[in-house]
Design a protein with these regions (language model features):
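Active-site anion/phosphate-binding pocket segments in diverse small-molecule metabolic enzymes
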Residues: 10, 51, 55-58, 62
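A short, polar/charged loop-to-alpha-helix boundary motif
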Residues: 19-25, 89-97
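Electropositive phosphate-/nucleotide-binding environments in soluble metabolic enzymes
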Residues: 42-49, 88, 99-106
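Peripheral (often C-terminal) accessory segments that flank ATP-dependent C-N-forming ligase machineries
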Residues: 43, 58-61, 71-73, 111-122
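Short amphipathic alpha-helical segments
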Residues: 49, 53, 109-110
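Generic C-terminus detector
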Residues: 93-95, 99-122
């Protein structure tokens, strides 16, 4: 999920229609179902968002990033990686997550510039 200015965005669930989420499933149109916000309980959503924000701070990240997680069948959450340069096309995951809370692509780009300039001026 994306973290923008230290605050987690909604979770996006990625479910490949077959196999694993590999290169083919990531880039071939129609190979995955992306659901945002993810169909999780409010408690599990809050837990995962807290982990994303905590990892963001622990890694001393700035401005924005996308934190990738997997959830096991029992609901265990595993942090896979911090992506410090996530895709930023209009259909990339971070813009989809922002759109889920009413932030347009244009507004997201403006927000990224705003937080970057604020960080630079510190």
């Amino acid at each position: 999920m994306g973290v923008l200015d230290g605050k987690a965005l909604p979770i996006i669930e990625i479910a490949p229609l077959s196999g694993f989420y590999d290169y083919k499933n990531k880039y071939q149109a129609g190979s995955t179902i992306e659901t945002c916000p993810a169909d999780l309980s409010p408690e599990k959503t809050a837990e995962m968002q807290k982990y994303a924000e905590t990892a963001f701070r622990a890694l001393r990240l700035k401005n924005y990033a996308r934190m990738d997680f997997m959830m096991g069948k029992a609901g265990d959450i595993y942090c896979l990686e911090a992506n410090t340069l996530p895709g930023m096309t209009p259909t990339s995951l971070l813009p989809q997550e922002a759109a889920a809370v009413g932030i347009s692509y244009e507004q997201l780009c403006e927000k990224l510039i705003e937080v970057s300039l604020r960080e630079r001026d510190r």
